[in-house]
Amino acid sequence: MAALTRQRAGESGVPTELHQKYYSQRATAGLVVTEGTFPAWTNRAFPGQAGIATDEQAEGWRAVADRVHEEGGTLFMQIMHGGRTSHPDLIDGANPEAPSAFDWGGTVRGFAGKMDAPVSRELKKEELPRIVCLLYTSDAADE
C-alpha cells in the first residue's frame, strides 16, 4: 500500500487508535507504507501530521506497528521533512528550513487555517548532516 499523509494526529502528532485501525485494516496488502511522518518538530509540514519526534509519538507508532503485525502485515515508516510546505504556525514560530530561501507564492495550512507560504530559511551546507541523520535514523525522539 502506498504512502499518504492523512493529518489525523491532532496538534500532539501522536498516532491514535484511528491510526491503529486504519493501518491494521490494510495489513493484508503486505507492505504498508505509513503517512509522511515528521522526525523533528521543526520538520512538521501539516496540521494533524503524525510525528516520531517524541517518546509519546514513538509509543503511538509502536501500537500501530503491533496491530499491523498481528494482522500479518509489515509496516514501513515514511519519514518526511516538511521543508517549504511548513509554516511558523506549525513549528513554534520558527521559519521553515528548506534547500533555498525561495518565495514560491503558494499557500500552506497551519493550525490557524490556510495562509500564505513564508519564505523559508535556506539550509547551510554544514546543516545537511543533521537533516540526513534525522531522515536516515528517525532517532528523532532524542532531539
Residue locations for each model-derived region?
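N-terminal capping/small domains of soluble enzymes
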Residues: 1-80
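General "foldedness" signal
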Residues: 13-15, 45-46, 89-93, 136
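Phosphate-binding glycine-rich loops and adjacent basic patches that engage nucleotide phosphates
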Residues: 20-32, 89-104, 142
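Conserved small/polar residues in nucleotide/adenosyl-binding loops
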Residues: 136-142
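Non-globular sequence segments
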Residues: 80-135
